[in-house]
Regions:
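Flexible, glycine-rich phosphate/dinucleotide-binding loops
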Residues: 77, 151, 189
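Structural beta-sheet core signal
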Residues: 41, 70, 144, 166-167
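Functionally critical loop-and-helix segments that line ligand-binding/catalytic clefts
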Residues: 1-21, 28, 33, 156-219
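Active-site-adjacent substructure of cysteine-protease-like catalytic cores
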Residues: 124, 152-157
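A generic structural signal for alpha->beta connector loops
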Residues: 65, 139-141, 162, 179
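Substrate-binding cleft of extracellular glycoside hydrolase catalytic domains
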Residues: 6-26, 37, 41-127, 137
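Aromatic-lined carbohydrate-recognition surfaces of secreted/lumenal glycan-active proteins
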Residues: 135-153
Length: 219
């Protein structure tokens, strides 16, 4: 069963948030009433857990007026990326997004951070390209969250197949020519009893935009 709503390009300057907490319908409505316009919720690297976004939660979020995109959980700091792991994680991101009901064309974000510092940049590149390939093949829009310890330079990030980048609140490199489509703000805060990171969307330097799912709730 597909989620309600349509794929839309993110509108520059709109505020939103990402969180690792299940949002009830009333919580989602409260965030929307406070002026937030979108949120990102997590899907797993494997079987979905109770903390990951469910179809019911996603429906409640969308019906509140908030736009929605999924982001995949990252491993604990010190993990070692590889091509095979990227393919596995990408396929699981697709499976879990489809299970929730996200339609093709929505942005799914890969969380790249906390990589083992002894890993070679090529291993990170191989992971990212394999993840991109699995998600892109399923007709989703692969996006890359660049967090602390991603290990790649701005140029190396730009050289990836990704065309959608999300800048974390950590000190991370600028991406030449393209830049970022979403900016995570510092610090993390609590709103409505929920720990969140605030985000703002923008067009990147090539005019690219994140693609989210949204229900038109009217005036």
């Amino acid at each position: 069963m597909s989620l309600p709503g349509q794929i839309q390009s993110a509108i520059p300057s709109l505020p939103g948030f990402d969180c690792d907490t299940t949002l009830t319908a009333s919580l989602a409505q409260k965030f929307f009433a406070q002026g937030y316009k979108f949120c990102l919720r997590y899907v797993s690297r494997g079987a979905e857990s109770t903390q990951d976004v469910s179809q019911q939660e996603a429906t409640d979020i969308l019906n509140s007026g908030l736009a929605l995109m999924p982001v995949q959980h990252v491993r604990k700091p010190g993990w070692s990326p590889s091509q095979s792991l990227g393919e596995q994680d990408g396929q699981n991101a697709v499976t879990n997004a489809q299970g929730v009901g996200f339609p093709a064309g929505v942005s799914i974000w890969c969380d790249l951070e906390g990589v083992d510092r002894t890993v070679q940049p090529q291993d990170v590149t191989d992971y990212c390209e394999a993840w991109f390939g699995a998600v892109n093949q399923a007709d989703y829009i692969p996006g890359l969250y660049v967090g602390a310890g991603a290990l790649l330079s701005g140029q190396q990030l730009h050289d990836l197949s990704f065309q959608h980048y999300w800048r974390s609140q950590s000190r991370v490199p600028d991406i030449p020519i393209r830049g970022y489509q979403m900016i995570q703000l510092f610090p993390s805060i609590q709103i409505n009893g929920v720990a969140v990171d605030l985000d703002v969307v923008q067009d990147d330097q090539q005019g690219g935009q994140a693609q989210w799912l949204q229900v038109d709730v009217g005036p």
